[in-house]
Amino acid sequence: MRHSTTLTGCATGAAGLLAATAAAAQQQSLEIIGRPQPGGTGFQPSASPVATQIHWLDGFILVIIAAITIFVTLLILYAVWRFHEKRNKVPARFTHNSPLEIAWTIVPIVILVAIGAFSLPVLFNQQEIPEADVTVKVTGYQWYWGYEYPDEEISFESYMIGSPATGGDNRMSPEVEQQLIEAGYSRDEFLLATDTAMVVPVNKTVVVQVTGADVIHSWTVPAFGVKQDAVPGRLAQLWFRAEREGIFFGQCSELCGISHAYMPITVKVVSEEAYAAWLEQARGGTYELSSVLPATPAGVSVE
């Protein structure tokens, strides 16, 4: 477990709230949804409207790119075959072809306009921050994340399980594997799972305010379609609305120093009831947040 982790909030009734709400939290069986797959080449499953739009746009542009690639490849192969010296004894001497030149000017313009017409609404949807149901401030540090719920007076830090802050050395060991198991994970989640998690309710608009404390980091959760640089001295915003309950992993996506690879992100999306129970417990005082809402492997409930 982490050597020293604190929560700021009301200091009274911590033990009572912990006992009262742990049972409610443990009834929440959370499937691990947003995570990289060995040998995977595609996107993680979409879990927000923003991610769904990005996936559609990627597929749309991929069709255009594939068509252009196939057309150009076939054109080159035809030119090599048709105008080979053996088949073209007398080389052509024309200098231009006006209809062809007009066509290869207009067609790219039409393609670019089409891409832009479908891309801009997706971009604007990401940049237009709606009214928040939940606001979370995220601060990037070397090499961990800090989370603050300003409306709830809750704040905590999040370290990778197996990092020096949790008693490890960023390598898998029997002790680290035991920590993962105690948190509800398996060794497959090493380098992804954290000792505490950002917890949000399902189907609610979450606005995340992102900043950095030392160098530039980047808070990224692929399943939500969000990535925002955490720049010291600046406060940026992103938003998402998770459409399904589960556990979603992300990672710092901006090279930030020697332990850049060891600052993952864990987001747990839960029901409104479980979220309310978590808030009540989290306000209770100082304890390990990993006990607030156990991470549970897919289909496994904690009894």
Swiss-Prot record:
Essential cofactor(s): Cu cation
Signal peptide span: 1-25
TM spans (from-to): 60-80, 104-124
UniProt keyword annotations, A-Z: Cell membrane, Copper, Electron transport, Membrane, Metal-binding, Respiratory chain, Signal, Translocase, Transmembrane, Transmembrane helix, Transport
Any one GO cellular component localisation term in the record: plasma membrane
Domain of life: Bacteria
One protein family per Pfam: COX2_TM
Principal cellular location given in the protein's record: membrane
Compartmental location: Cell membrane
Coiled coil: none
A GO term, aspect molecular function: copper ion binding
Job of this protein: Subunits I and II form the functional core of the enzyme complex. Electrons originating in cytochrome c are transferred via heme a and Cu(A) to the binuclear center formed by heme a3 and Cu(B).
Family: Belongs to the cytochrome c oxidase subunit 2 family.
Protein name, as recorded: Cytochrome c oxidase subunit 2
The species this protein was found in: Cereibacter sphaeroides
Gene assigned in the entry: ctaC
